Amino acid sequence: MAQQQGMDSALFERRLRPVYDNLEVGNNRKALQESEKLLRKHPNLLCARALKGLSLLRLGRYDESHGCLQTVAEEKPTDDSTLQVLSFCYREMEQLDKIVELYQHAVKQNPGNEELLAHLFISHVRVEDYKAQQAVALQLYKAQPKNAYYFWSVISVVFQGIRGPESALPEKRKIYLGLAQRMVDKHIKEGKMETEQEAFLYLHILKLQNKYQEAWEFLTGELCAKLYPGAPVSMKFELLKELGNWRELNELLQQLLDADRDRWDFYKEYIQSSFELLKLTPQGVENGDKDSLARCQEFLQRIIDSSERKKRGPYLARLELHQRMRAEQLPAEKLIGDFDEMVIEYFRLFGDKSCCTHDIALFLPSISMNQRQALASKLLLESGVTSTSLPKNKEQLQKHLCALQISRMCGSHMDLPADHLLAFYTALKLHYEHGRTTFGKKLLATEMGPSDAYALLAANVMYDLSRRENKSDHLFEALCLLQYVLRNSTSNFHVKLLSLKIYHLFGCQVGAQEMYEYLDIKQIQLDSMGYVHCQLLALGGRFSGNRNVYDATLKFFTNSYKERLEYIALTYRFCTFSKMEEFMNFKERLTNSLQYVACSVEAQICDLVSCYGNITQNLSAYVAMSIEPAEDRIAWHELSDNRDLGAIIRWDPLHEVDAAEERRESFDQEVEVLQVRSLMLRLFASFIDLYHGAGLKDSPAGAETATLELLRESWTGLFQRLRVMNYKPLAQKFLVNLLPTRLHLLLDMPYERFFDDLAQLVLDLQSGSAKLAEQCKRVGDNVIATMELCVQTINESNESNGIDGLWKRRGQQQKVAASLEMLSLYAFLLSVLNDKLQVSSKTKTKKKPVENKVDGPQPISEKERSQMLQELMRQLKHKFEACDTAIRSWKAPVLPRDLSSFMSDMSLKPEVEATLIGDVSATFKDSHELMVTELRNLLKDKIRMVAK
């Protein structure tokens, strides 16, 4: 240590530089060599030892790294370089509490050191210890009276009130927020408030206490005007609404809308304030409604008339006012005009914009079905395109598209007979091809084709037909059309998403994977958009292939977790109080993301199912998973649904779509699926730990057995509850609807009985129960039933190939995959049990037998248990061979019609049709062959595993 402190600073930095440089470029082996070289000359150089630990960590030599870092930490370093390297290591290992300990020791040795105290504060921020944050912030303020440190203590008090352990108690929340307000009040009286972020924090504290009048007075006062001139207008809206000051809000919004005439959010607030003013009008006053709403209508009309360029905002506001008045049973038509005429006027002005469909759809729910369909017919006439004409320019094409989309949303297509739907589909294809060849030339690679939406609409129409007939041919044709569009518009993500959905619907994982990769989903999209692929992969038939997708997703979550912590730390460093809660909420949503938790569980199950090494390698892989059967690590009540369900564009009939209900139902079912999968993983882990848990965990004798029995009880209880809940499969009425979850598959397959009987077998084997033979037979019967289900499903798939090989394909693949999953886990368990019994019997043969004169039933001998286990393994081997034979005979899906029939329907160029349909068909064939190869390789590994 003395050598380190005495070393010249420049020399110190120069000698460490090669290590830093190599670590920065990822040359970890060279960094290790350089650090060891430096340590030979300076063995007490703590920073070099810490860098050696970091190099070892990056090389994956975790045990050596841990020992090296532990040695350095025990020296209780105080120099910044060593502390920073150690902190970096502990952040990578997610051992954030150790960073706190490091800086606590350093601060004890240098109590007044501002830099060390600041690092200690940030280390408390990372572990969300708000009380400790407050104490350290006050220490900092005493050492260096800076505003930043004072407000660190204020925000720490605020977070104790709204996020801390006592935040659920109203009286505690009140105390903490009151304290925070008094702290800031004191600072204001002393004239020490200096920045806009400090002003924001004060306003936030007042709003949290519902002190809206005080907040308004501060916001409109001199100090706030000086420090926070850029306070968002929304803050004024919020306060005026809470105070019920609708008149002032109305006047403020008029001023803002005069300045910015296209702010739809402002218009909605303005209309709301007008209706609130109407409520305040005394009942005895005549024409009170006219005074308030007439002024609103006049204001909107004045903006429309005086605007040089036509903007959507005021026209939408007028439609919103009309809709609100009708909802309140006020004379909207008398005051504003005919609703249909206003929509048609809007369509004339803005129908050439792609957003027009969504805009008009906002107001359709307020009119009857007959009115909707009548309006849709008027819009089609207004577009100027008939059944015998084509759009003359891009603008007319977009208007026609908008009218068709609105027509579908009004339900005009749902009752058409099949031949009319086919004719409509043909017309949509022709419109697409005309638009592509006429208006879609010389587009940039990033542009979507102007007529692409025709093909998207056509795909939806063909799904309606396929569902009506329960046949796949129409939907397969739609898939071919979408692939054709994708060749022409490579950046159209709507086409990719629909293609991905159809591939999954048909159980074609290769095609789905291609589309998923083509989407190029990255970063936060892996959470918000990953559901379109990841949630549909499990039990699809490709265990090892799925693992790669899970790895890419999980890598984002683990890497971004560290980044999210640093974002929060940066908001403290720069005192950006307005962003703190936003970043914290973001961190919590990602940490508790259903996508993240589900991928983690499925990845571990995939690993256990796919184990192919010897028993030692398999157990090492299992131990590395760090599964704790006794501990449920999932915060079930905090799981977050981060899916962007609006990403897939839809124009389905509004009266048959309930997006909120669909989201709720699918989320509830996905959580139940996660419950089953997580509990299955923990239950299976308890089987392994019962035999190979000794030495791995510090637990009292009998704890593993108790854990197993508790988990077994939870397992059967979960299935009983799920059957009582009686969940219905997700509706599949439209192409955009989410595919059914695996919940009903898990309930229909013999998961419950299979693992329940396995639990009893494991317990009987351990105790040598007299009922072991009976239990072995029960488990053997389960294996036979599961194998027969697998073979039967494959036979059914082969038989249905003559009629329609695609329509039920996904469900058939899931049944086969689920059967093999259960049998593969069973094989892994048998190999573990067999290994343990063999080791145990060898140990006991060396000991002399002891006479046992105790009365009562005696445990079955180790030898007999081993023989029974060997018989189970032989039986399983034969069943695996039977499954392998069946899978080898599994035929690729045959299309319901021949390719020439499809080509005649496609109505595209002959040379395009041949390659297009051939490529899509080849994708299905490749997917089947790859799945069969993977499943057969899995079975070969399992046959080898149990052939002992």
UniProtKB/Swiss-Prot annotation:
UniProt repeat feature TPR, residue ranges: 46-79, 80-113, 523-560
Protein task: Non-catalytic subunit of the NatB complex which catalyzes acetylation of the N-terminal methionine residues of proteins beginning with Met-Asp or Met-Glu. Has 2 roles in the larval immune response: required both for the phagocytic degradation of internalized bacteria and for the induction of Defensin in the fat body. Within the phagocytic blood cells, has a role in detection of infection and activation of the humoral immune response.
Protein name: Phagocyte signaling-impaired protein
Phylogenetic classification of the source organism: Eukaryota, Metazoa, Ecdysozoa, Arthropoda, Hexapoda
Gene (name only): psidin
Assembly and oligomerization: Component of the N-terminal acetyltransferase B (NatB) complex.
Disruption phenotype: Flies are deficient in the induction of Defensin whether the infection was with a Gram-negative or Gram-positive micro-organism.
Species of provenance: Drosophila melanogaster (Fruit fly)
Single Gene Ontology BP annotation: border follicle cell migration
One Pfam entry name: NatB_MDM20
